[in-house]
Amino acid sequence: MAKKKAPAPTAAELKDLAQRLETLLRLRTLPIGMRHFDDEASFDAVPGLRRPKPGRHFSTCQLVTQARVAGLTVGIRHENVRPWSNCGGVIGLNAPSDDYLSGRKMAGVWFADLKNARLHQAQMPRVTPGRHIGLVVSPLRSARLDPPDICLFYGTPGQTILFVNGLQHGRYKRYDMSITGESACADSWGRALATRKTSISIPCYAERRYGGVADDEMLVACPPDEFRRGVEGLEALSKVGLRYPIPPYGANMDPAEGMDVSYGAGGKRSA
């Protein structure tokens, strides 16, 4: 008989999981959640909601940074991001204008010609526009999104691979990264919001310039049930000594002594 799927974690459970993840991986900034809203009443009812000042336009990555660094719960509408841009387009709050979709905005900047700039736009993951009126970003520790659509955290490559190892511990699956290039938020929260699949990406130039993403940071976005599986898997790995930070063994040492502890003498673990 197939194993019954556990119910999705609640906001309270995700708060606890986020705290455990911070301890396990020693994260620099807060794990966050994102949730789409389809009506103004439920959007405005989110506890502690902050809205950008009217007339000010941000990149989505700037507003995400306000949540993960300052701990704010931020409500995002189309009028809060650059008008008819990919910022709103990636999260489904607008369709990008023809200036973007045609490639004119990025031709001669990120791409040599209009053809390649247009291909970049055509292949970019996006949430279908017209379904949602807003998106709220909030730290998981605040438990204000019950539940979020996706959970996210920024980590170093070492932290990221250990989280993937945690995801694979109890249910193996091969994970792929996608890289759009510039506008790589499409590969993280854009793809995860659109597909509800775990998405791993390297933040782009704009995320680092405007959103303040550190040079060594990657971004993981996943549905709440995968977030739980990753944290629980990390805890299981910790029990067998596979923890963060990863202690370097030394390039001039025989690895057998270390590997034998994990895998058994001669590379074979005893039954």
PLM feature spans:
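Acidic, serine/proline-rich low-complexity intrinsically disordered regions
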Residues: 3-271
